[in-house]
Amino acid sequence: MPLSVFAEEFAEKSVKRYIGQGLWLPCNLSDYYYYQEFHDEGGYGSIHRVMDKATGNEVIMKHSYKLDFSPGILPEWWSKFGSLTDDLRERVVSNHQLRVSREAQILVQASTVLPEMKLHDYFDDGESFILIMDYGGRSLENIASSHKKKITNLVRYRAYKGNWFYKNWLKQVVDYMIKIYHKIKILYDIGIYHNDLKPENVLVDGDHITIIDFGVADFVPDENERKTWSCYDFRGTIDYIPPEVGTTGSFDPWHQTVWCFGVMLYFLSFMEYPFHIDNQFLEYALEGEKLDKLPEPFAQLIRECLSVDPDKRPLTSLLDRLTELHHHLQTIDVW
């Protein structure tokens, strides 16, 4: 939906608000939120900033099309019914044709261990669903873009080895990666696989980071129900597809997650992806000359995360390696 159309229609946008336990309340978005501004958009739909009328808090509204809708179920304790006035309760209806999205289910489950991922509201307008979540700050991709020109020039002229600014940027990158690892591992341990981990889906607000966009996320079965993940289960960004998806037609979610860390480390170091052609990752043509100018432990970690053999990636030692690398960057002046 074009931005101008959505902004103009917001005040009168008729939706159904999910109250819980299969109940819906016909209403307008403007009954609960003030529209503020457009934030971002993609193939899924669009992101907008709105203000909660009840609290005055700025929150994020994600408007997603039902092109690839996966239904979910919210637990019984997730309910808005108790906060309704008597006259609103009379308008609540049961609609078995409406379902909440799997993304909403994942957010509610994730918020039990990561409160910043709380789902505040859920709406359905027939053609799309709308999620209301906390505002988590700037995306890591946006932060990186603010340094892109300087880093690109340092890389282009091979002037980044030993550069003070670049060393501090690498240290910041590793700090981000450690925080991202903790969040992703917590989610993975409760059975949630993000499936699209990248800087665009990491928000930074001071010292805090939030993982966002669970539109293609999936549930990880326990070891007793372990399934084979086929290439069709990978629905993330093409620049983050691990080689085993193409060579064997299957992959392991954690192996792919570690691969994503390698791609992110490379991208944030050089402001470009390690593989530029759609199928180049199958040939694994890393540019060694660039990596050789990084601190050796940094370059080695990228190489291992981007190993063609999934079992040779630092599957169990990634956090330790990142922590050691962070300490190494703090103790060296130049390399």
UniProtKB/Swiss-Prot annotation:
Superkingdom field: Viruses
| Family label | Belongs to the protein kinase superfamily. Ser/Thr protein kinase family.
> Which positions are catalytic residues?
196
Q: Which InterPro entries does the record cross-reference, listed alphabetically?
A: Kinase-like_dom_sf, Prot_kinase_dom, Ser/Thr_kinase_AS
What are the GO BP annotations of this UniProt entry? Answer: intracellular signal transduction
Top-tier EC class: transferase
Q: Which residues bind ATP?
A: 39-47, 62
Q: Does Aminoacyl-tRNA synthetase count among this protein's keywords?
A: no
Q: Which UniProt keywords apply?
A: ATP-binding, Kinase, Nucleotide-binding, Serine/threonine-protein kinase, Transferase
- According to the record, the signal peptide region is none
Please give the Gene Ontology molecular function terms for this protein. Answer: ATP binding; protein serine/threonine kinase activity
The EC number(s) this enzyme carries = 2.7.11.-
Q: Which organism is it from?
A: Invertebrate iridescent virus 3
Return the protein name: Putative serine/threonine-protein kinase 040L
| Disulfide-bonded cysteines | none
